[in-house]
Regions:
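A conserved short coil-to-beta-strand element within the FAD-binding core of flavoproteins
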Residues: 246-262, 366-378, 387-390
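General small-molecule cofactor/ligand-binding pocket signal
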Residues: 204, 243-247, 290, 362-364, ...
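Short beta-strand to alpha-helix junction loop
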Residues: 138-146, 220-232, 246, 250-257, ...
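Ferredoxin-type iron-sulfur electron-transfer modules and their immediate structural context
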Residues: 1-176, 227, 269-286, 361, ...
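Rossmann-like dinucleotide/flavin-binding elements
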Residues: 182-206, 246-256, 275-277, 294-350, ...
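Rossmann-like dinucleotide-binding cores of NAD(P)H-dependent redox enzymes
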Residues: 205, 209-240, 244, 299, ...
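Short gly/ser/thr-rich secondary-structure transition/capping motifs
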Residues: 8, 158-166, 247-250, 291-298, ...
């Protein structure tokens, strides 16, 4: 039949439309188009009308001299792109690789992912899943399992006889000869190296530990992401020409100035936040008290294989959940988490919290540590007081306690996972780079450049504690800025 002469007309229910595009694909007459005004969970976006050039008097009020720093005045609409892509810090073309995977084009899907993310297999296991939070399908029933799809695509590549190695972007296929040093082989540093390699550089990554990986190897338990997966992803970087110099601490074994003398033109500092925050309460010096990050390092290295007795974990974030789950696997005793926040206020991702509960971790809300108790230099228990509120009316961290309501819990181990602090050593010695708050390295928010022109920063030491996907995005931005710095005009 001739579809254009059909007596039937299409009927749509706007309340059920999720902008999946299926009607566009199947309409035999090609009469349906999917425009840029995508719907959201709150309904279609209403765009304001723009002034027309011939109706505008172009005075100073229509000219923004500082447009690079205030580009919010430029009327670009993130909602014109798939919400999942907008929500992803790395801006991966999620809607694209899902479609390719649906068509069985797994190799093409992987190539699309790796344009923006060098570690899809790792992220498939530990990603924050901002994309699923924004998925429009969630307004109908539940979001697509985007992370699982990405993980499946990456697994196909890992099973392949020949791994996919991204090609260099250079039109001339000639490498840039400028030497770039990256300090820190965590997700941000390796991401920067990856995108510089794609651009045509041969970056050198300096890592003080014995192997690259940073928190992916040392800080995240192997039951969340296998170390073989991390190492497999790192091997691809080596094939791309990235050089790793492990066991070298910049600032101690070699300085930035010495590296300059060796011909390095730019530096990307991504050393993370390596020091566990302390409680600063009585008894913290007792044997059996350990920082959560130090505990995870010890577990991942194989130095700690078991714990004796009951364990108390202080903290309510994802790191605290990791610590508690790791401890549960090493002790025959109980593992209890105590945090300041109420259940609905906990900063941990719900999926991670549920995984901890499934493992047998008991979460106790609205309690703050008051003192760690001990005998003969060893932990015997902990005294806690009720936490009434965590933040003030302005949302600032300002916990309020009721010291009249306390409990004492016996235990043999106290693991503290309440945050991370900086431990830069002498990595910035001899440079103008600063840490004004004693924690993060000051930098330009767009270029990640410090007060020392050839020194750039990224990852947690620039932004504060965030997720792996945020570090990956930070590494890419750093690579772009470094490329423009060493090749003026690019």
């Amino acid at each position: 039949p001739n579809p254009s002469a059909s007596a039937y007309t299409a009927e749509t229910d706007p309340e059920k439309c999720v902008a999946c595009g299926k009607c566009v694909e199947t309409c035999p007459a090609g009469a349906v188009r999917l425009g840029q005004k995508l719907c959201t969970k709150e309904g279609p976006i209403q765009y304001p009308r723009h002034e027309l050039p011939d109706d505008t008097k172009w005075g100073e009020d229509h000219w923004n001299k500082n447009y690079r720093n205030e580009n919010g005045s430029i009327q670009t609409w993130p909602t014109g792109t798939a919400p999942c892509k907008v929500a992803c810090p790395a801006h991966i073309a999620i809607q694209g690789y899902i479609k390719m995977a649906a068509d069985g084009r797994y190799a093409d899907a992987l190539k699309l992912i790796k344009k923006d993310n060098p570690f899809p297999a790792v992220c498939g296991s530990i990603c924050r899943k901002y994309c699923e939070d924004a998925c429009t399908r969630g307004s109908v029933d539940q979001p697509l399992a985007i992370d699982e799809i990405k993980k499946f695509i990456a697994e196909q590549d890992m099973k392949a006889e020949h791994r996919y190695v991204p090609a260099m972007n250079s039109c001339t296929h000639e490498k840039f000869d400028q030497k770039i040093a990256i300090i820190g082989a965590g997700p941000a540093g390796m991401s920067c190296a990856y995108f510089l390699a794609i651009e045509g550089y041969s970056p050198v990554v300096f890592e003080k530990e014995a192997a690259p990986g940073g928190m992916l190897i040392n800080g995240i338990p192997s039951f969340r992401v296998g170390k073989d997966i991390v190492k497999s992803e790192i091997d691809v970087l080596r094939e791309m020409g990235v050089e790793f110099r492990c066991g070298v601490e910049v600032g101690k074994d070699v300085t930035i100035q010495q590296l300059r003398e060796e011909g390095f033109r730019a530096f990307y500092v991504a050393v993370g936040l390596q020091k566990a925050a302390k409680l600063n309460i009585p008894g913290e010096e007792l044997a059996g008290v350990q920082g959560g990050l130090d505990f995870l390092r010890s577990v991942n290295s194989g130095a700690t294989k078991e714990l004796s007795g009951d364990v108390i974990v202080i903290g309510g974030g994802n790191a605290a959940i990791d610590v508690a789950r790791a401890a549960k696997r090493l002790t025959g005793g109980s593992v209890n988490m105590y945090c300041l926040e109420k259940d609905e206020e906990m900063p941990t991702v719900p999926d991670e919290k549920n995984a901890g509960i499934a493992d047998g971790v008991v979460i106790n809300n609205s309690w703050a540590p008051k003192a760690i108790l001990g005998e003969d230099g060893k932990v015997t228990g902990i005294e806690l007081m009720r936490c009434v509120s965590v933040r003030d009316a302005n949302g600032k961290f300002a916990p309020v306690y009721d010291e009249n309501e306390t409990i004492t819990v016996p235990c043999s181990n106290v693991l503290v996972a309440i945050g991370q602090r900086s431990e830069y050593g002498a990595v910035l010695a001899g440079t103008a780079a600063e840490t004004p708050d004693g924690r993060l390295i000051a930098h330009d928010v767009i270029t990640f450049q410090t007060a020392e022109p050839d020194v750039f920063v990224g990852g947690d030491c620039a932004t504060g504690p965030k997720y792996t996907i945020d570090a990956i995005a930070s590494g890419r931005e750093g690579a772009v800025s470094i490329h423009r710095y060493v090749n003026v005009g690019q």
